[in-house]
UniProtKB/Swiss-Prot annotation:
GO terms for molecular function: RNA binding; RNA methyltransferase activity. This is Uncharacterized tRNA/rRNA methyltransferase BB_0516. Pfam families: SpoU_methylase, SpoU_sub_bind. GO terms for cellular component: cytosol. Its EC number is 2.1.1.-. PANTHER family: 23S RRNA (GUANOSINE-2'-O-)-METHYLTRANSFERASE RLMB. Keywords: Methyltransferase, Transferase. InterPro entries: Alpha/beta_knot_MTases (IPR029028), Ribosomal_eL30-like_sf (IPR029064), rRNA_MeTrfase_TrmH (IPR004441), SpoU_MeTrfase (IPR001537), SpoU_subst-bd (IPR013123), tRNA_m1G_MTases_N (IPR029026). Belongs to the class IV-like SAM-binding methyltransferase superfamily. RNA methyltransferase TrmH family.
Length: 228
């Protein structure tokens, strides 16, 4: 891991001291070199180079998931977020940032047609992607069935769903599903859900950005459960 910076400032001095305590190598380079490394992205004069942890294979993750579900049996409340083919890494990063702030227990993504952990996700999430527990599955419907066996109720965001303000949520184990930026949630997943919910809006366009919707739905569900 390397801490790379362009010029000294009170902020870089503070970060440099922190880097030293963590035995992180410090490298000073000029502006052009930093622009080239970061492909001219807004870097505020410094950067951290690190290696992202590789995802476990799906088979290993499935076993970990089952073990995790066993631990949820001992918890009074649990909240899992499932993302059905969220493809934009900036949306994924923003969702992970929200998930971290609201202490979501697990974020599940699909193996295919989903954004992967990368530098864009890390940056958009402001580092939250490194704190959120995540796993990948091949089939969300199979995952839903497993969650139901462990007492989870499935809530899915859908434009034709019930107004979330007009339903009473009192389930202790919640799984919230959000869908692809363009297509939304797959039909079979909606059919396998316990509730379809929507956010009431009054604008001229018909939907919110998926990362915004995620934050609003998580907040409202947690508010109703007195978990804020």
């Amino acid at each position: 891991m390397n801490f790379i910076y362009q010029k000294k400032s009170p902020k870089t001095k503070e970060i440099e001291q922190l880097a030293k305590t963590q035995n992180i190598k410090i490298i000073r380079i000029n502006t052009n070199e930093l622009d080239k490394i970061l492909k001219n992205k807004d870097h505020r004069g410094f950067a951290l180079k690190l290696k992202l942890e590789k995802n476990k294979n799906v088979k290993t993750q499935t076993k970990d998931f089952e073990n995790l579900l066993e631990t949820f049996k001992k918890k009074e409340n649990a909240f899992i977020l499932l993302l059905d083919e969220i493809e934009d890494p900036q949306n994924f990063g923003a969702i992970l940032r929200t998930a971290e702030q609201f202490s979501i227990d697990l974020v599940i993504t699909t193996q295919k047609r989903s954004a992967k952990d990368n530098s864009t996700v890390l940056r958009t999430s402001s580092g939250a992607s490194q704190y959120v527990k995540k796993m990948t599955v091949t089939n969300i419907n199979n995952t839903i069935n497993l969650l139901k066996n462990y007492g989870f109720w499935i809530y899915t965001g859908d434009i034709k769903g019930q107004d979330i303000n007009k339903i009473k949520i009192n389930d202790k184990k919640i799984a919230l599903i959000l869908g692809n930026e363009g297509k939304g949630v797959h039909k079979l997943i909606k059919e396998n859900s316990d509730f379809l919910i929507r956010i009431p809006t009054s604008g001229k366009i018909d939907s919110l950005n998926v990362s915004v919707s995620t934050g609003i739905l998580i907040f409202e569900i947690k508010r109703q459960l007195n978990l804020l």
